[in-house]
UniProtKB/Swiss-Prot annotation:
The gene is rplI. This is Large ribosomal subunit protein bL9. One of its GO terms (biological process) is translation. Binds to the 23S rRNA. The keyword Plastid does not apply. Belongs to the bacterial ribosomal protein bL9 family. Pfam families: Ribosomal_L9_C, Ribosomal_L9_N. GO terms for molecular function: rRNA binding; structural constituent of ribosome.
Amino acid sequence: MKVILLEDIASLGKKNEIIDVSDGYAKNFLIRQKKAVALTNKSQEVLNKDLAILEAQEQQAILDATLLKDKLEQKPLQFFLKTNNLQTFGSISNKQIIDEINKEQKFITKHMITKPHALGIGEHIVEILLHKKVTAKLHVIVSKE
């Protein structure tokens, strides 16, 4: 019997996949537990509509992330560290970078920065994962105060 999975099942497949299982397993477990629905013309149409909506949402998310990437990469972030002759005091953390970016809008979280950084004096590139397919390379300049 062919069924459409309504949720991810480790041994069978992912949500919205069409799989072929035995009739008893489908009727007695998957359908009864609401983990799948039987494949019919109507359920196939509903699945196709849902997949089209998900694809459109994914494309919109990629477009939004690309626009945000362009905005972030336009201007570098400038930070200043206190120093005395040879010694710097502190470094620039991910939290400071996120706070600076989020002054205008809240759209970057600490989990979006791919590698943890403690930036000293100099020019640095910080990668920010905006979407699983879009990564922004933010230019950060740290100089002496």
